[in-house]
């Protein structure tokens, strides 16, 4: 978890635009910040993780440039975005999903994303797929309406995902690996 990372890292900063307040806690802190104007000095991070963020940003290239400003030369950028196929199904299933404020503003195609990353000054050295078991959850959510609460199949699937994340049983790990 976050505490484990914080114990091994010299310092850790997490940012969230919707955060109510800043929460410093030992060697890590949570900040409310914009990806376009990060509140850090040039070259202040050894590594940056941008997980499931880029697809929410209207100016993705601007955000990548800003990350390049705070990242030390040669430092890695770990980036993840939703897979094109499953995301396209979500968009097809739900007008609400694809038009919700703060939601996903684009679907990335792998080659186009890699080209943009390279053009932004980074080098793609590895890629893989993950979260295959989460895809049916989002399809269910989109079928019934992403903001609808109390739909039993969605709630049960969510419980399965939480159980899987916490327990990591071999059967779901195998299914995830095969489906990815």
Question: Language-model segments: which ranges?
Answer:
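Short, flexible active-site-adjacent loop segments at beta-strand->alpha-helix junctions, enriched
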Residues: 54, 83-85, 95, 128-133
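Acceptor-substrate binding/catalytic loop of class I
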Residues: 95-112, 129-130
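Soluble or luminal CAZymes and related metallo-dependent hydrolases
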Residues: 4, 59, 105-109, 163-167, ...
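Conserved beta-strand segments of alpha/beta enzyme cores
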Residues: 27-29, 123-126
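A C-terminal cap/extension of S-adenosyl-L-methionine-dependent methyltransferases
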Residues: 92, 125, 130-180
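Short, hinge-like loop/turn segments at secondary-structure boundaries
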Residues: 12-14, 95-98, 142-146
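A structural motif corresponding to the C-terminal end of an alpha-helix
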Residues: 116-122
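Conserved SAM-binding loop
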Residues: 1-90, 110-114
């Amino acid at each position: 978890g976050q505490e484990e990372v914080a114990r091994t890292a010299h310092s850790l900063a997490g940012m969230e635009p919707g955060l109510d307040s800043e929460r410093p806690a030992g060697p890590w802190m949570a900040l409310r910040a914009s990806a376009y104007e990060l509140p850090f000095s040039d070259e202040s991070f050894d590594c940056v993780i941008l997980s499931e963020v880029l697809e929410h940003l209207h100016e993705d290239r601007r955000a990548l440039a800003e990350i390049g400003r705070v990242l030390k030369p040669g430092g890695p950028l770990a980036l993840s975005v939703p897979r094109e196929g499953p995301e396209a199904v979500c968009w097809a299933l739900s007008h609400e999903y694809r038009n919700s404020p703060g939601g996903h503003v684009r679907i990335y195609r792998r080659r186009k994303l890699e080209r943009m990353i390279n053009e932004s000054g980074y080098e793609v050295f590895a890629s893989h797929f993950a979260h295959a078991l989460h895809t049916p959850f989002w399809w269910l959510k989109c079928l019934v309406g992403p903001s609808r609460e109390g739909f039993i199949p969605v709630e049960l699937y969510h419980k399965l995902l939480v159980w899987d994340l916490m327990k990591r049983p071999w059967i779901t790990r195998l299914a995830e690996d095969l489906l990815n």
